[in-house]
Structures are given as C-alpha cells and as structure tokens.
C-alpha cells in the first residue's frame, strides 16, 4: 500500500505539467487551387481506313514475303505499323518494320516485307496499323501459305514439312516423290561417274579378259 501511494505522489506533478493536445486537425477547409482546363482532344473523325488487304507467302526455306495495302483518309505521316506472327507456342514481335512504298497517292499505302525467316509452324501474320497517331489501332491477319512450284527441284524438306502443317497432303506427297526421284537420279549419275573414272580403269588393268572381244 505504501508503494502505491508513493507512485501516485510522483505521477501527480508530471501529469499536471503535460500540455493539452488539440484534437482539431483543420479549423478551416484548405483553399482550392485553380487549374487550367485541359486542351480539347483533336478531332480525328476524318481519318479512317476504308479498305485493308494482306497477302503473305512462304518461299523456300521459310522466308516470309508479305504485302499490305491500305486505302482511306490517312494522316501524313502515318504511324509506323507493327508486324507480329503467331506460332503454336504463342506470339513473337521480332519481325522488322515493313518497308513503305513511296507513291504520290495520299489515300493508299503499301507496305512490303521480304526474305524474313519465320518458323515452319507459323499460323498467322498480324499487321497492326492506325490511320493517325490518335486514332484507334486496327489489325489485319493473313495465313501464310508455302509457295512450291510444280517441279519442286529446289524445294527443301522443310517446305514439305510446311505443306503437311498446312494440311496440303497431296502437294506434300507429290513434292516428296519428285525429290525422291531427283535424289535417285543424282545417285545414279554419281555411280556412273565413279564407275567410268575409277572402277572401269581398275578392271581394265587387273581383269583385261573381261573386256576382250570374246565377250
């Protein structure tokens, strides 16, 4: 009991000397800061794309060649388009910027992409474009098809694999037959050259009776 009385005696002067805290945070509301109004958005209703077309093929070795045509009221300069390709694993954006054809027309533009190697299992090529910098972005897609001639002497096995991926089995079997015949004729020609240069001369020297008139 004496200990409690001593603590209360020491606490009384300390509590009496503590300052009173104000619980009011803001006596008056803060003043409003006047800001300048935002500039109006530019009117882009006049810019539009009325027609878009995409054509893309795969040359020998999986080299992509694509052409995109745009017609409409386009701004000058037009925003740089982007090209992506889609495979079975996903999308890729490593495609370089397409080249724009220089023409005098302001209502039509053409973009080219040549000799860019893509995977054999490419499903789609997507071309993203916009008629102006503030306009909505559009895209047009195309499915690349392997371009194989009727006599596919220079086609590779990758091209045949691409034909099978596109479910063009008849063309793939035809190309495989031509390539098999080509390799067979090449092997026959190599054997004939080897026979004439080496084997026949060796037989003449060691077995001359094989080439006598009696035979």
UniProtKB/Swiss-Prot annotation:
Residues 204-215 are cytoplasmic. Residues 1-17 form the signal peptide. Residues 47-146 form the Ig-like H-type domain. It comes from the Viruses. GO terms for biological process: symbiont-mediated perturbation of host defense response. It is found in: Host endoplasmic reticulum membrane. The keyword Transmembrane applies. Its main location: host cell. Glycans are attached at residue 73. Keywords: Disulfide bond, Early protein, Glycoprotein, Host endoplasmic reticulum, Host membrane, Host-virus interaction, Immunoglobulin domain, Late protein, Membrane, Signal, Transmembrane, Transmembrane helix, Viral immunoevasion. It is a single-pass type I membrane protein. Disulfide bonds join 56-142. The keyword Disulfide bond applies. Residues 18-182 are lumenal. The chain crosses the membrane at residues 183-203. One of its GO terms (cellular component) is host cell endoplasmic reticulum membrane. InterPro entries: CMV_US. Participates in the inhibition of the host immune response. Redirects newly synthesized major histocompatibility complex (MHC) class I heavy chains via the SEC61 translocon to the cytosol where they undergo proteasome-dependent destruction. In consequence, infected cells are masked for immune recognition by cytotoxic T-lymphocytes. Belongs to the cytomegalovirus US6 family. Interacts with host TRAM1. This is Unique short US11 glycoprotein.
């Amino acid at each position: 009991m004496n200990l409690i009385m001593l603590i209360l005696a020491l606490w009384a002067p300390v509590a009496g000397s503590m300052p009173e805290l104000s619980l009011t945070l803001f006596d008056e509301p803060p003043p409003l800061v006047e800001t300048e109004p935002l500039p109006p958005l530019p009117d882009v209703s006049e810019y539009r794309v009325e027609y878009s077309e995409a054509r893309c093929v795969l040359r020998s070795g999986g080299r992509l060649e694509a052409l995109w045509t745009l017609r409409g009221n386009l701004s000058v300069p037009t925003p740089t388009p982007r090209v992506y390709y889609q495979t079975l694993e996903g999308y890729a954006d490593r495609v370089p910027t397409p080249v724009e054809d220089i023409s005098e027309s302001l209502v039509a533009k053409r973009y080219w992409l040549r000799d860019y190697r893509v995977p054999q299992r490419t499903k789609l090529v997507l071309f993203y474009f916009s008629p102006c910098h503030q306009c909505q972005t559009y895209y047009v897609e195309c499915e690349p098809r392997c371009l194989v001639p009727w006599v596919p002497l220079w086609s590779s096995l990758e091209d045949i694999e691409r034909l099978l991926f596109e479910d063009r089995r008849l063309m793939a079997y035809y190309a495989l037959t031509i390539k098999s015949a080509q390799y067979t004729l090449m092997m026959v020609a190599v054997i004939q050259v080897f026979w004439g240069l080496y084997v026949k001369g060796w037989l003449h020297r060691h077995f001359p009776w094989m080439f006598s008139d009696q035979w």
